[in-house]
């Protein structure tokens, strides 16, 4: 079963972490919700995702040995898709399994970038490993992410 993130994402931007970059802390009850919230926060740096219609979809499959690398590769894939397909994403249905390694399968939806319709805040070039952390808490999951803008 695929999990969709809640309509009100649980993240906050961290202004004092990286001056030239964008940083945020995200939360989720499940890993799927956490990763979806991180994806949404990444695109919120660039655009008001409420203005991005889920008209175009992409399938994603990522495998990694640990959660930090899985999140890094997931966000990297989204940034790459944004750059190559010229799409902002706003909806994320994800499923994460753990066997010998973590596997993220999902569908992401977005809309072609339209500078007349969408006000672009700033461009995200990449996710960084600086202060990157995915951590299980007593009441769910937390991630800290710094993006190169």
Where are these regions (language model features)?
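N-terminal intrinsically disordered, cationic/polar leader segments
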Residues: 5-149
